[in-house]
């Protein structure tokens, strides 16, 4: 944003405060707490226009020690202060005290004035009779001048300041309090915050603005935007929602309850429909006491709302606020918004609507600039013995016929190193065991019989319906070889079924195992206890509903996550719990094994995702950044990244190596409930309660497709084994198949609009829909493609 710095027209003078420095609360979400010691805003002086929080010493963990910058202009409405020297003696002390009291009265700081007057033993009449407002004698002139060098002075000059994050700087607005510049003609106050974090956050709403003017301020801006040109109206309309929320919260915090109620009733209907859930929560905040325990309000306050606006639209807004001298709105723009300015044509209404909707606005362009290794790791070389009958398609059961072994050509499919793949040793992965190699051989054999899907060859769908599931089915998973299916239930149990004729058996007791010949060829069969054989195993251990389940790639283990805040690892050899992983403070909504095993990820109500290893009791990484519950988690095919979907309506991609967030995707209008990566690792599909499926290019961090058709929450997404078909399952009792090849073809990513970080989405989602398959009355909870590209779906029958 260096180019914007050329707009600076005035220079602020920085003075060390004579008293103890005012500690401003760090701006969470913009680098606070990283030990920079400076402000969290971008641009010159630590903030575009607001230089009051510029630090004089660094390294304080993100809490800035501010110097105070004084505007060259006098505060509007204040009388000029003569520079006469004070007289000596006791009269001077009295005059000084009266000058301070007069200053507090002019600033409408009645409580401070009353406390100081009582302490000095002065009568009310003495203060009232010391002179009319603005008439300060020479004895108090120096004191008043000194005070003015410490406090907030807001001077509506010829040019309005730019908001933090834009990098531009106009006329300097000086802020010595957490609330930013005061109203026109007022001198603000210095506020020292020694309160807990919540109080420090809420104190930003402590201002002296006229509550009766809020409706006029908002109506004036609304009228200006609605009367602007069409090309600017869509972009400037993004201001409505964040300004509405912050103005309402200011009124509530300052106990103007009637004005707040009137303001909400008048303007809440003007907000976009996808913000209605947030507005319902906001409407319940009618008193100052309600704000301290409300997470939604704190989220909105501590994270700057991001708006992406073209330079032309921004200049139009800047001129309007300059002419109207609307400092109340400009204060909110400075303190709570991050305006990301780009050069180029303003975006259309359609482009903006496709990207907005999250709790904190759009993602900053810088958030999606990191390099992502989305390629696949090189597969190990394994010789696959193929029979002649297998090649001719005669051996349907895939059993070896003891023919002469041959090398499978498909074994060399991924032998070439992908240029976009991470280094093989970027993160330590478990070594392949002999059983893993055998499983890969079976997988490659199945691949030779895989059906090639497409618009003219759609897959068959096998639906597993859970009947009489009065325990409440909450989670489903299927093993990679499609031999086992697990269900998590609200009665805190996990149930495992065999979907093949082979029954589930436990390992024999230790006393019986000692009698087995370990050198025999069928030792793996002999260790199993036939007396325990059954089609169903029930696992007990959780103390709350089970919300997530995931099989390990080798089918030896099962993970389950629960409302009790734990993730449990179950052995599928003994059907007992091996480990309970404790780290989450609240319910754990989802968990998933890495494609290579060993690692797994979990996400829950505490707004963080955690990376674990099966042999560690504590998490290896904590992925923190979401503003609401982490509803779903998914490993990238190369295991170097983890995707998380949240109730804050964003999707984040995390680097397993260092725990950094490398991608933030916004565009959903409801909480995200499903994620899946394409088999080549380049694309990500996400589904949410808004019924839409969005497609993302991971390498460029851009939305490349939008699939509309579902009328309820999209609970499950899965690509076919070769990536030709995308299947989606929803609470609307349907499975839909989409043409993934057509959705991603002809994407010239090099021609993406770099200025806006967005492309024009093709309006052909119905053309991409290949088929819709309805169930009788069963929401689709889980989808799975077998190794031969047969679709398995699962859900619990719920009669209307």
Curated annotation (Swiss-Prot):
It is found in: Nucleus. Gene3D superfamilies: TFIID subunit TAF5, NTD2 domain, YVTN repeat-like/Quinoprotein amine dehydrogenase. Residues 165-189 have a biased composition (Low complexity). Residues 407-418 have a biased composition (Basic and acidic residues). SMART domains: WD40. Residues 384-395 have a biased composition (Acidic residues). The keyword GTP-binding does not apply. Residues 30-50 have a biased composition (Gly residues). WD repeats lie at residues 468-507, 541-580, 583-624, 625-666, 667-706, 709-748. GO terms for molecular function: identical protein binding; RNA polymerase II general transcription initiation factor activity. Residues 194-340 are annotated as: NTD2. InterPro entries: G-protein_beta_WD-40_rep (IPR020472), LisH (IPR006594), TFIID_NTD2 (IPR007582), TFIID_NTD2_sf (IPR037264), WD40/YVTN_repeat-like_dom_sf (IPR015943), WD40_repeat_CS (IPR019775), WD40_repeat_dom_sf (IPR036322), WD40_rpt (IPR001680). Pfam families: TFIID_NTD2, WD40. CDD domains: TAF5_NTD2, WD40. Distinct domains of TAF5/TAFII100 are required for functional interaction with transcription factor TFIIFB (RAP30) and incorporation into the TFIID complex. Homodimer. Component of the TFIID basal transcription factor complex, composed of TATA-box-binding protein TBP, and a number of TBP-associated factors (TAFs), including TAF1, TAF2, TAF3, TAF4, TAF5, TAF6, TAF7, TAF8, TAF9, TAF10, TAF11, TAF12 and TAF13. The TFIID complex structure can be divided into 3 modules TFIID-A, TFIID-B, and TFIID-C. TAF5 forms the TFIID-A module together with TAF3 and TBP, and in TFIID-B with TAF8. Component of the TFTC-HAT complex, at least composed of TAF5L, TAF6L, TADA3L, SUPT3H/SPT3, TAF2, TAF4, TAF5, GCN5L2/GCN5, TAF10 and TRRAP. Belongs to the WD repeat TAF5 family. The TFIID basal transcription factor complex plays a major role in the initiation of RNA polymerase II (Pol II)-dependent transcription. TFIID recognizes and binds promoters with or without a TATA box via its subunit TBP, a TATA-box-binding protein, and promotes assembly of the pre-initiation complex (PIC). The TFIID complex consists of TBP and TBP-associated factors (TAFs), including TAF1, TAF2, TAF3, TAF4, TAF5, TAF6, TAF7, TAF8, TAF9, TAF10, TAF11, TAF12 and TAF13. The TFIID complex structure can be divided into 3 modules TFIID-A, TFIID-B, and TFIID-C. PANTHER family: TRANSCRIPTION INITIATION FACTOR TFIID, TRANSCRIPTION INITIATION FACTOR TFIID SUBUNIT 5. This is Transcription initiation factor TFIID subunit 5. It comes from Homo sapiens (Human). The gene is TAF5.
């Amino acid at each position: 944003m260096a180019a914007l710095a050329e707009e600076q027209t005035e220079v602020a003078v920085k003075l060390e405060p004579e008293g103890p420095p005012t500690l401003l609360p760090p701006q969470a979400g913009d680098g606070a707490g990283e030990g920079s010691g400076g402000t969290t805003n971008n641009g010159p002086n630590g903030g575009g226009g607001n230089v009051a929080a510029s630090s004089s010493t660094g390294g304080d963990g993100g809490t800035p020690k501010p110097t105070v910058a004084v505007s060259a202009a006098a505060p509007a409405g204040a009388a000029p202060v003569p520079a006469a020297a004070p007289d000596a003696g006791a009269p001077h002390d009295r005059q000084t005290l009266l000058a301070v009291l007069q200053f507090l009265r002019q600033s409408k700081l009645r409580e401070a004035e009353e406390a100081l007057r009582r302490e000095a033993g002065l009568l009310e009449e003495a203060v009232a009779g010391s002179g009319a407002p603005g008439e300060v004698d020479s004895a108090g002139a120096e004191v008043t001048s000194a005070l003015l060098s410490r406090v907030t002075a807001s001077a509506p000059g010829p040019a309005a300041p730019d908001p933090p994050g834009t990098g531009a700087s106009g006329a300097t607005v000086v802020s010595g309090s957490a609330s930013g510049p005061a109203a026109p003609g007022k001198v603000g106050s210095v506020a020292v915050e020694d309160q807990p974090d919540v109080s420090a956050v809420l104190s930003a709403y402590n201002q002296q603005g006229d509550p009766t003017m809020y409706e006029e301020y908002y109506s004036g801006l609304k009228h200006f935007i609605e009367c602007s040109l069409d090309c600017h109206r869509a972009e400037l309309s993004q201001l409505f929602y964040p300004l509405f929320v912050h103005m309402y919260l200011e009124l509530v915090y300052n106990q103007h309850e009637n004005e707040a109620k009137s303001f909400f009733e008048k303007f809440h209907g003007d907000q976009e429909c996808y913000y209605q859930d947030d507005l319902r929560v906001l409407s319940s905040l009618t008193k100052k006491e309600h704000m301290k325990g409300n997470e939604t309000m704190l989220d909105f306050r501590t994270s700057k709302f991001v708006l992406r606006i073209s330079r032309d639209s921004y200049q139009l807004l800047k001129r309007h606020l300059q002419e109207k001298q609307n400092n109340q709105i400009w204060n909110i723009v400075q303190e709570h918004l991050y305006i990301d300015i780009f050069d180029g044509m303003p975006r259309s209404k359609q482009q903006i609507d496709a990207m907005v909707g999250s709790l904190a606005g759009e993602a900053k362009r810088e958030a999606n600039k990191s390099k992502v290794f989305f390629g696949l790791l090189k597969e190990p070389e394994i010789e696959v013995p193929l029979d002649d009958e297998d090649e001719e398609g005669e051996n349907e059961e895939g059993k070896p016929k003891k023919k002469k072994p041959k090398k499978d050509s498909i074994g060399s499919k991924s032998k070439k190193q992908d240029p976009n793949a991470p280094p093989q040793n970027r993160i330590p992965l478990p070594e392949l065991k002999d059983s893993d190699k055998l499983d890969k051989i079976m997988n490659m054999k199945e691949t030779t019989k895989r059906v090639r899907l497409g618009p003219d060859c759609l897959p068959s769908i096998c639906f597993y319906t859970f009947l009489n599931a009065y325990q409440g089915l909450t989670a489903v998973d299927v093993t990679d070889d499609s031999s086992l299916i697990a269900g998590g239930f609200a009665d805190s149990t996990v149930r495992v079924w065999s979907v093949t004729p082979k029954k589930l058996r436990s390992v024999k007791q230790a006393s019986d195992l000692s009698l087995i010949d370990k050198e025999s060829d069928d030792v793996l069969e002999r260790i199993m206890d036939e007396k325990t054989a059954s089609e169903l195993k029930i696992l007990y251990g959780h103390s709350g509903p089970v919300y997530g389940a995931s099989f390990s790639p080798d089918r030896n283990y099962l993970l389950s996550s629960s409302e009790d805040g734990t993730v449990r690892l179950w052995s599928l050899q003994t059907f007992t719990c091996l480990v309970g992983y404790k780290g989450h403070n609240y319910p754990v909504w989802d968990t998933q094994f890495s494609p290579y095993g060993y690692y797994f990820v979990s996400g829950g109500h505490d707004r963080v995702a955690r990376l674990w290893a099966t042999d560690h009791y504590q998490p290896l990484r904590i992925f923190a950044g979401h503003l609401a519950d982490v509803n779903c988690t998914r490993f990238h095919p190369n295991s170097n990244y983890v995707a998380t979907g949240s109730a804050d309506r964003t999707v984040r991609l995390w680097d397993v190596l260092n725990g950094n967030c490398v991608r933030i995707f916004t565009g959903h209008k409801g909480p995200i409930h499903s994620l899946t990566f394409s088999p080549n690792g380049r694309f990500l599909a996400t589904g949410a309660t808004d019924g839409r499926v969005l497609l993302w290019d991971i390498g460029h961090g851009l939305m490349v497709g939008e699939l509309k058709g579902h009328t309820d929450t999209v609970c499950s997404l899965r690509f076919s084994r070769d990536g030709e078909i995308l299947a989606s399952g929803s609470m609307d009792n349907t499975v839909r198949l989409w043409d993934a090849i057509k959705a991603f073809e002809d994407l010239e990513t090099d021609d993406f609009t770099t200025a806006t970080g967005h492309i024009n989405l093709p309006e052909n989602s119905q053309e991409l829909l290949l088929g819709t398959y309805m169930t009788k009355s069963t929401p689709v909870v889980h989808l799975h493609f077998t190794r031969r590209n047969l679709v398995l779906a699962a859900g619990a029958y719920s009669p209307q």
